[in-house]
Design a protein with these regions (language model features):
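Alpha/beta-hydrolase active-site loop
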Residues: 93-123, 144
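Short, proline-enriched alpha-helix->beta-strand connector loops that line the catalytic pocket
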Residues: 170-175, 236-240
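Active-site-adjacent alpha-helix of alpha/beta-hydrolase-fold enzymes
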Residues: 181-240, 248, 254-273
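Acidic/histidine-rich helix-loop elements
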Residues: 82-101, 256-270
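Short substrate-entry loop that stabilizes the transition state in hydrolases
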Residues: 33-82, 153, 165-166, 184-187
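A domain-start/cap signature at the N-terminus of enzymes
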Residues: 1-41, 53-54, 69, 104-109, ...
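Short beta-strand/loop motif that positions the catalytic acidic residue
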Residues: 177-179
Length: 291
């Protein structure tokens, strides 16, 4: 069985010049095999302080290449704590009081749009099956991009970082949000911080409203300490979902990787497998099915 690290080592290294900067990204092409139509795409966004290889190892979403997906992982433009960070509209980086001067010329939402265009030129991709995922700062960027991109995305998955920018008339593609009740970096109940002022359930509820879903979610206990809130639409689907994990801090639950798994500080949890959930969600909303 191929390990996550081996999968990442197979990834192609590419560069894209955007906004006067050379931006790097990793690409895993769909593994050869019969397919009836162009491939679905996942763009996986790293957290602040890490990079694309660490994100793919932690999320395990590179494994989707074996199921017919193309998987791309770009790199943020701002150096941060030994890794990289994304420039998010109107807010400073975590732990910083003001927006960096160097961030003023970086529009990472526009960069992601340019990346989608670049990938469309490199591979036969299905424009109706584009998916965006991210952890922490990557999830916050995914939230902004999902609103800005309109119908360019089939779905989005945000682990430890969902936000709801924009208003009720803005785009709201299917959303899977996973968050820990013990998260001290991006607290579940919000914080006195312009970067993270809205409680997670409120952000998801506003997303559901924009998507035309019921305001009151269906609540289930899917496992001990794991509560799912699913907002249904008029067709009976559940395209907006929040998974709250009681034992989880600021980590990607279920990953064996210590960088995303919070093993060092004890904030991780094996109560929920976010990687499997994200793969299943993408398969449900436009992607090829992947176990």
């Amino acid at each position: 069985m191929t390990t996550r690290a081996e999968t990442v080592r197979r990834a192609e290294r590419h560069e894209l010049t955007y906004g006067g900067r050379r931006r790097r990204f990793l690409l895993l092409r769909p593994e050869p095999g019969p397919r009836e139509r162009p491939a679905p795409l996942v763009v996986d966004l790293h957290p602040s302080g890490l990079g694309p290889a660490a994100q793919l190892r932690g999320s395990g979403l590179g494994e989707l290449a074996a199921h017919g997906y193309a998987v791309a992982a770009p790199q943020g433009a701002l150096p941060y704590q030994g890794g990289w960070a994304w420039s998010l509209p109107g807010v400073p980086l975590a732990g910083e009081e003001r927006i960096r001067d160097e961030a003023a010329g970086v529009d990472d939402v526009a960069f992601l749009a340019a990346l989608l265009d670049t990938l469309d030129g490199m591979l036969p991709l299905d424009p109706a099956r584009r998916h965006l995922s991210g952890f922490s700062g990557g999830a916050r960027l995914a939230s902004h991009a999902a609103v800005a991109f309109g119908d360019r995305l089939a779905s989005v998955a945000c682990v430890g970082g969902v936000r709801r920018p924009g208003g009720p008339g803005d785009a709201a593609p299917p959303l899977l949000a996973v968050h820990g009740l013990r998260d001290a970096t991006n607290p579940y109940r919000g914080a006195a911080d312009p970067r993270w002022d809205e409680p997670v359930p409120d952000a998801v509820a506003r997303w559901a409203g924009a998507a035309g879903c019921a305001a009151e979610p269906v609540r289930t206990e899917s496992a001990p300490g794991v509560t799912e809130f699913r907002h249904r639409d008029a067709a009976g689907r559940e395209p907006v979902r929040l998974v709250a994990v009681a034992s989880l801090g600021h980590a990607w639950p279920g990953t064996p990787d210590p960088l995303l798994g919070g093993h060092a500080d004890g904030s991780g949890s094996d109560a929920y497998d976010a990687s499997a959930a994200v793969r299943g969600f993408f398969g449900e909303f436009g992607g090829a099915r992947a176990a």
